[in-house]
Design a protein with these regions (language model features):
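Signal peptide-proximal N-terminal region
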Residues: 63-86, 177-181
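Extracytoplasmic ligand/sensor domains, especially the bilobed periplasmic-binding protein
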Residues: 110-217, 266-290
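Extracellular/periplasmic periplasmic-binding protein-like sensory domains
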Residues: 258-329, 396-408
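Segments of small-molecule ligand-sensing domains
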Residues: 315-324, 333-392
Length: 409
């Protein structure tokens, strides 16, 4: 049997994983029975906060990464290099926990690290990895400082909150204009770490220019166990729109508390809402989730490949959250770079990532193009919870529903 038939190559992998049309048709992911690729294997650091306040998101991120690793290995691994050997790390929901894992992964000889999830973790872990010229692919972390420090080892697959906030506000203005401008006042509720505080600063700078008056900006720590006082403030000020920016647990609690206290603004419009674009939230608390809009990471709903993976994830009894398909796509990106580099050498892999044009992901991005570590094609979409489902409402090219605004009474 020839080497070509024995091992993973780029085209074959994309044709035989969840990225295959046949998988989309059946809802399963078919992997051919082929021999292991030649080589001793490639170690990949898979780093997420799987315990602590961010554990749900971290576990979802690990799930997505490992599904991609398992599929690549079932297809034979990386041609000429062997199978991917995942080195799992738990950031424990803290930057310090993350950097400790980077040290362990470097000692273990990983070729690359994927993950991090939270902005403050990613800032610390990418810096730690840079000391060893260890390539690092950020899955989600949105703080733009992650990619503005000149770190040659750092690559962010998704958009940062500069792009996200600009898109979110342009879309909010468009939705409001289309409805006859019923909304004029806003309150912002955000978590107080790097992610939420940075986003709140951008919103405060940009919302007034779009004709919105900001009544109040309310920070809160992560974790927060009680939002009664926050919701009482919202109820007293009665804003037209509430903009939450927080992680999953706090988002759910805020939305449920608003529902319980019968606070009904014209719209709940999230920017990177931790639960707003989550099937878990919609299933477990459908009444609290109704009509919530979000600007966030999301898969391309027209992409049959993405729908195939969704079926497989749900078949495992899990929810298809953005952490899953972002990490899945990131591992495919790394596999493609390893294939092109034909080496697990860190410098060669860094160069291969920097020159990537990978398009076999699940996102509405187009081909990957890194400029100073940022994927220039990455962009968020707007979603809304409609009929106990999550629909894309903007941009029109990816939409499968139209926005409902103001929220029905």
């Amino acid at each position: 049997m020839s080497d070509k038939k024995q091992s993973f190559d780029r085209r074959r992998f994309l044709a035989t994983t969840a990225l295959g049309a046949a998988a989309a048709a059946t809802g399963t992911i078919a992997i051919p029975s082929i021999l292991r690729a030649q080589g001793s294997g490639v170690k990949l650091g898979v780093l997420h906060p799987v315990t602590g306040a961010l554990s749900y998101s971290g576990q979802q991120g690990r799930l997505g990464a490992m599904m991609a690793v398992d599929e690549i290995n079932a297809a034979g691994g990386i041609k000429g290099l062997g199978k991917i050997d995942p080195v799992l790390g738990d950031a424990q929901s803290t930057p310090e926990g993350g950097t400790a894992e980077v040290e362990k992964m470097n000692s273990a000889g990983v070729a690359c690290i994927v993950g991090g999830y939270a902005s403050n973790i990613c800032l610390a872990t990418t810096q730690a990895a840079a000391r060893y010229e260890l390539p690092y692919v950020v899955d989600v972390g949105v703080a733009d400082g992650i990619v503005t420090r000149g770190l040659k080892n750092t690559f962010r697959f998704g958009p940062g909150f500069g792009v996200i906030s600009k898109t979110a506000l342009a879309n909010l203005a468009a939705i409001n204009d289309q409805a006859g401008k019923p909304a004029k006042t806003v309150m912002i509720v955000h978590e107080d770490s790097l992610f939420g505080s940075g986003l709140a600063k951008l919103l405060n700078a940009q919302l007034p220019a779009l004709g919105f008056q900001i009544l109040e900006t309310i920070p809160h720590p992560t974790p927060t166990r009680d939002f009664n006082n926050v919701v009482l403030k919202i109820k007293a000020q009665n804003p037209d729109i509430v903009i939450p920016a927080n992680y999953y647990n706090e988002y759910v609690l805020l939305a449920r508390t608003m529902q319980q206290q019968q606070v009904k603004p014209k719209g709940i419009y999230s920017v990177l809402g931790g639960a707003a674009s989550s099937y878990k939230f919609v299933k477990e608390f459908p009444d609290a989730a109704k009509f919530i809009m979000d600007c966030n990471h999301w898969f391309d709903p027209r992409n049959a490949k993405a729908q195939a993976l969704k079926k497989q994830v749900e078949g495992k009894g899990q929810f298809y959250t953005y952490e899953v398909y972002m990490n899945y796509s990131c591992v495919l990106l790394i596999a493609d770079a390893l294939q092109r580099a034909a080496s697990a050498d860190r410098a060669k892999l860094t160069d291969a990532l920097a020159s990537s044009t990978f398009a076999g992901h699940l996102m509405p991005y187009g081909p990957t193009k890194f400029v100073n570590g940022q994927n220039e094609g990455a962009a968020p979409v707007n979603t809304q919870v409609l009929d106990n489902d999550i629909k894309v409402i903007l941009p029109a090219a990816f939409a499968n529903a139209k926005p409902v605004f103001p929220m029905p009474a």
